[in-house]
Amino acid sequence: RQGWTENTEPASQQEAYEMIGEAFDFSEKYQIPVLMRVTTRMAHSRAVVEIGEPRQQNTLHYPERPRQWILMPGNSRVRYKTLIEENKLFEQEAEHSRHNRYIDGPDKSMGIIACGLAYNYIMENFPEGCPFPVLKISQYPLPTALVQRMASECRSLLIVEEGQPLVEEMIRGLLGTPIPVKGRLSGELPRTGELTPDNVRGALGLPRRESEAASQLTMPRPPALCQGCGHRDVYTALNDVLREH
């Protein structure tokens, strides 16, 4: 939000793979960096993905406008104005992105805006199909036209997102207060910690599922440096010195 740049938030490993290639195209088209937000759950997962044909590497060349990459005060003021103007184009890209989908539903009492991986938690709770309209967002800036469409069709909105409630804050500012907007700020979802299918289930108004007790618990352990990391030897030496002194 502060960088005025393009941002993606994949909902699956396949989508993350596809977004990387599209991010390079977007970056070259608009001459800006593209960020990808990967949540902890996504980073600690793996899956088989379908890969595309390899592309030939671009020929290296000197940038046409080198000053735009040097953000000294004189350049940054001009660049900031340009980014504000280009942000309208970025929003149009998000409106038509295949990664942002509006899925209609018969029950208009609530519309659900699910960001990135949170979309999976919604669908996991509705294996037969969600009865509420769902707006899946995985490419930013916020597709405001899609949000306004949902707000005009539904009597309330539930924002399901990981981390800070940035989208919830933006939607509250965008809509004002014509309809209730629920999420982490309003208490329907926990303010801190990762989302899970179970706490999302509560926000959807569904009864809590009975779960079986775990057969055994994994004992907690402090974080460790990865095997093969060169820093392990340094810390081993430091611990040896500390024991001696």
Outline where the language-model segments fall.
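Flexible, low-complexity linker and terminal segments
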Residues: 10-225, 230-231
